[in-house]
Curated annotation (Swiss-Prot):
HAMAP family, per database record: Ile_tRNA_synth_type1 (MF_02002)
One of the record's GO molecular function terms: ATP binding
Organism field: Helicobacter pylori (strain P12)
Residues binding L-isoleucyl-5'-AMP, per UniProt: E569
InterPro entries: aa-tRNA-synth_I_CS (IPR001412), aa-tRNA-synth_Ia (IPR002300), Anticodon_Ile_BEm (IPR033708), Ile-tRNA-ligase (IPR002301), Ile-tRNA-ligase_type1 (IPR023585), Ile-tRNA_ligase (IPR050081), M/V/L/I-tRNA-synth_anticd-bd (IPR013155), Rossmann-like_a/b/a_fold (IPR014729)
Entry EC number(s): 6.1.1.5
Matches recorded under SUPFAM superfamilies: Anticodon-binding domain of a subclass of class I aminoacyl-tRNA synthetases, Nucleotidylyl transferase, ValRS/IleRS/LeuRS editing domain
Cofactor note: Binds 1 zinc ion per subunit.
The protein's role, per its UniProt record: Catalyzes the attachment of isoleucine to tRNA(Ile). As IleRS can inadvertently accommodate and process structurally similar amino acids such as valine, to avoid such errors it has two additional distinct tRNA(Ile)-dependent editing activities. One activity is designated as 'pretransfer' editing and involves the hydrolysis of activated Val-AMP. The other activity is designated 'posttransfer' editing and involves deacylation of mischarged Val-tRNA(Ile).
Protein name: Isoleucine--tRNA ligase
Name of the top EC class for this enzyme: ligase
Residues spanned by motif 'KMSKS' region: 610-614
Length: 920
């Protein structure tokens, strides 16, 4: 029998089925760098508008992990999506270079080397070198992810110009009257020996003593109440702060019950406390809390007076309704102390140990000196004697240092604060507080997901003043001078601008290197002896929070517009970078420095647990890239609901690889089947079949859905729509139905050429939608298809832009054939019947079949294509409703070329194939 294989259009493509991504991607990326791909993104000729994504800086310490990859890949997808829409792109990656983790690394290294480094300039130099080293490491690791940005000129918070910009932002805060030095309690990390801002605190479960203590009322107070004995009962989980108690806070207008044994508690809590055995059950007298105000009790620990006050923070859900108050160790206590002019006692040093103040003020005996407060609690509880009514242990959520993961304490120190509730002048001349301005600004910002808006609002509503000062060395100094004659800071513009200029030229190391005289402008140098330097450094959240100024505003738009269009970070940044950026933006410009906030979740293991080396559940980013390639990692990011935590394991990446293969193999099939197309056919109109119109309409519907989802940054929804189209309509229906024409019709056959145009349109849309995600792969697709490049008028991936399929194909509309759904329903029923015949060995495949249908209205050619049968006819006899067709073996012979049963003679080509063979 004659062999006809060579007469078929079995086209191939040099685009490989296997991507070999880990080998090929670095070559592609090197080409992009050589061709300055990002500069092309910045200088788009068909510019439809500008788009700025402002990068929240990662910390320049350590290697990248999968969480970094998630963040940078999402940003890259957003940026590239905007670029392919036709926008000019601004995206400058940056690094946060100052701060405690680097200091700790250097201190640990010095400890191992058994050396000390008292010189702050040399110490800062080592910190700077450490940051430089890891900045370069991380930069190269980011590039492996296929991300593009201005990596040639990234921003670094330790650059001299940047440090000067941070300082100038601080100066603006001071000039607007929002920067104040205050002695008040703040979070204190005894492990770091430094103040902490709220954003540097994390909450974890901690076991603490829970004690109920009786404070006996003084004689004069008992007389006023006309009772013989009464003790207010307080509840606390911080017995170590009892030494500093100066007051007890009650709830205003609440009823307090005095028991038979003389214990005074909130009546609303009496029954619960009696059940616990804290107090006895019989009530002998009731008092309104307002009548107890200004009475005095005695602290059983040191016999000092404790004033009875009324506080709005007192609740009646837990405890006793009487709150132990130590203004030196609690923020609410501190503000209550301002109202009642209470003494602020604080005798705990930087290491969390009792200092000599306990002796001078007769707060504790000498044996407690130098003892850590947590260690001392057992002795303090014992010292309470009969005043201790109940001791338990509870496990509760407690603030910890986010760097050392050790518990923190509240400790009153002199620090610098940005005031949240101090009115300042707005651009329109009105006066508002920072809290008010920030809350108003949030309303004008779009959040993805929308729940982020309320989350940030709640945090701003409840946050305390921002503690800016840190007692460390590696950071931007709080570079102000205190005038010793007035004990007030010097905020004169001439002085502040002189310091800023020094920082810009020589870096802020000069604050440690230069004398006061050398730091002052000439007109102030004669009075240098009257000034002293503030030696705190700035909270690093102020560094990163002012990046919009240093990157966008200071460059006057060269690196993007302010406010930026989008910022995109992990959901933990509601309490970190989102807040610090918002507050500084509202101080400097009375508005948020961003228009849209997108947040993502965290990377967890397949059980939903946080990854850690100790658990052994860490998935290595480097190993993933080597095994799967960056495009698969990128697809994994896009194919997940990033707004929630992302579960990860090798299994998930294997699944993603299957998705990748589906897209890749589909593109390979498309490329192969229009590879022999004459480029002249691209410009003319074609006669598209009903089946072509069906798939083009499906493509249009898919495009609308994907575009809509991608516009909302819902990449997983968009990709699922795209994958459903590829799997169902394209692979499941259209491509199978077209194979006969593609392989067996003449190359110049109009029907075949129309199909090729449709395949080109589909490939174009796939490339457009996948390019922001699978950028390497789409670049490879275009490298291997001259026809597709000509159709798109693109020489590479960065020439891609959205196309109108109807315009490209010279079609006014897509007309899906009538009764098409009925044909699809027929196809489904047919496949069931075909499976039965195969099992009974009646036929081997659909090509052996012929079918008769009851309705003439159904297009016979369309049925033949969709069902891939060899003959379709209309039944002469009436058919039953189910099934509405008759299936039987085709009455003709198998064509040895196309394999359809249409030949009138055995081993002879059918009429269609004979015609094609004549043309060859």
């Amino acid at each position: 029998m004659k062999e006809y294989k060579d007469t078929l259009n079995l086209n191939t493509t040099t685009f490989s089925m296997k991507g070999n991504l880990s080998v090929n991607e670095p070559k592609t990326y090197a080409k992009w760098q050589e061709q300055q791909a990002f500069k092309r993104m910045q200088n788009r000729k068909d510019n439809h508008g500008d788009f700025t994504l402002h990068d929240g800086p990662p910390y320049a310490n350590g290697h990248l992990h999968l969480g970094h990859a998630l963040n940078k890949i999402l940003k890259d997808i957003v940026v590239k999506r905007e670029y392919f829409k036709g926008n000019k792109i601004y995206y400058t990656p940056g690094w946060d270079c100052h701060g405690l983790p680097i200091e700790q690394q250097i201190l640990e290294r010095l400890e191992k080397e058994k050396t000390s480094l008292e010189n702050p300039t040399l110490f800062r130099e080592k910190c700077r070198d450490h940051a430089k080293k890891f900045l370069e490491i991380q930069k190269n690791e980011f590039l492996q992810l296929g991300v593009l940005g201005d990596f040639e000129d990234p921003y670094k918070t330790m650059d001299f110009k940047f440090e000067a910009s941070i300082y100038r932002a601080l100066v603006e805060v001071a000039k607007k009257g929002l920067l104040k030095e205050r002695h008040k309690p703040i979070y204190w990390s005894y492990a770091c020996e430094s103040a902490l801002a709220e954003a540097e605190v994390e909450y974890k479960m901690k076991k603490s003593p829970s004690i109920f203590v009786a404070f006996g009322l003084k004689k004069e107070s008992l007389e006023k109440l006309k009772v013989k004995k009464a003790s207010l009962v307080i509840w606390t989980t911080t017995p170590w702060t009892l030494y500093a108690n100066v007051a007890i806070a009650l709830k205003k207008d609440a009823v307090y019950a005095l028991t038979q044994k003389g214990y005074l508690v909130a009546k609303a809590l009496h029954e619960k406390l009696a059940a616990l055995g804290v107090v006895d059950s019989e009530i002998v007298h009731e008092f309104n809390s307002n009548d107890l105000e200004y009475l005095k009790a005695t602290n059983p620990l040191n016999q000092r007076d404790s004033l009875i006050t009324l506080g709005e923070h007192v609740g009646l859900e837990d405890g006793t309704g009487a709150v132990h108050t130590a203004p030196g160790h609690g923020e609410e206590d501190y503000y209550l102390g301002l109202r009642y002019n209470l003494e602020v006692l604080m005798s705990v040093d930087e290491r969390g140990c009792y200092d000599e103040g306990i002796i001078h003020n007769q707060l504790l005996d000498e044996s407690y000196l130098g003892e850590h407060v947590f260690k001392a609690q057992k002795r303090i509880i014992e010292q309470l004697g009969d005043s201790l009514l109940l001791e338990q242990e509870i496990e509760h959520s407690y603030p910890h240092c986010w760097r050392t993961h050790k518990p923190v304490i509240y400790r009153a120190t002199t620090q610098w604060f940005i005031l949240m509730d101090e009115p300042f002048i707005q651009n329109d001349g009105s006066q508002k507080t920072l809290r008010e301005v920030a809350l108003n600004a949030i309303e004008k910002v779009e959040f993805v997901p929308n729940s982020g808006k309320n989350r940030l609002k709640t945090m701003i509503e409840n946050r305390p003043d921002w503690c800016l000062s840190r007692q460390r060395k590696w950071g931007v100094p709080l570079a102000f001078f205190i005038d010793k004659r007035t004990n007030k800071p010097c905020f004169e513009s001439e002085v502040l601008e002189h310091v800023a200029n020094l920082f810009e030229k020589k870096g802020c190391d000069v604050w440690w290197e230069y004398s006061v005289k050398d730091l002052l402008p000439p007109s102030y140098q004669e009075d240098a002896m009257h000034y002293e330097k503030v030696m705190h450094i700035l909270d690093v959240w102020f560094d990163s929070g002012s990046t919009f100024k240093a990157v966008l505003e200071d460059y006057h738009g060269e690196k993007g517009q302010s406010p930026s269009d989008v910022i995109l970070e992990g959901s933990d940044q509601h309490r970190g970078w989102f807040q610090s950026s918002l507050l500084i933006g509202c101080i400097l410009n009375n508005q948020a420095p961003f228009k849209k906030v997108i947040t993502h979740g965290f990377i967890v293991d397949e059980k939903g647990e946080k990854m850690s080396k100790s658990k052994g559940n860490v998935v290595s980013l480097d190993n993933l890239l080597k095994k799967h390639g960056s495009d698969v990692v990128r697809l994994w990011v896009a194919f997940n609901d990033y707004q929630n935590d992302l579960r990860v394991s090798q299994t998930f990446f294997i699944q993603t690889e299957q998705h990748y293969k589906k897209f890749r193999n589909t593109l390979k099939f498309l490329l192969a089947n229009f590879s022999d197309m004459d480029l002249k056919n691209l410009e003319r109109s074609h006669d598209f079949s009903p089946l072509d119109h069906f798939i083009l309409e499906a493509l249009e519907t898919t495009s609308t859905g994907v575009n809509s989802a991608f516009e909302e940054h819902d990449f997983v929804k968009g990709l699922n729509i795209l994958m459903a189209f590829v799997t169902n309509e394209l692979s499941g229906i259209y491509l199978d139905a077209c194979k006969d024409s593609l392989y067996c019709d003449s190359k110049n056959n109009e029907k075949r050429q129309a199909i090729q145009m449709v395949l080109l349109a589909i490939a174009s849309k796939l490339c457009y939608f996948l390019a922001p995600i699978l950028t390497h792969t789409i670049e490879e697709v275009l490298e291997h298809s001259q026809v597709l490049c000509a159709f798109l008028q693109a020489k590479d991936v960065f020439d891609l832009k959205g196309i109108s399929v109807s315009e490209k194909l010279h079609l006014k509309e897509f007309k899906k054939p009538e009764n098409f759904e009925a044909v699809l329903a027929l196809r489904s029923a047919f496949n069931e019947e075909l499976d039965r015949l195969k099992k009974e060995s009646v036929v081997k495949n659909s090509l052996e079949c012929a079918i008769e249908v009851k309705e003439k209205a159904l297009r016979e050619n369309l049925i033949e294509e969709l069902l891939m049968v060899s003959f379709v006819g209309v039944a002469k006899e009436k058919l039953s409703e189910t099934p509405a067709f008759t299936l039987f073996k085709a009455p003709f012979y198998k064509c040895p070329r196309c394999w359809r049963f249409k030949s009138e003679l055995e081993n002879t080509p059918c009429k269609r194939c004979e015609e094609v063979l004549k043309e060859r």
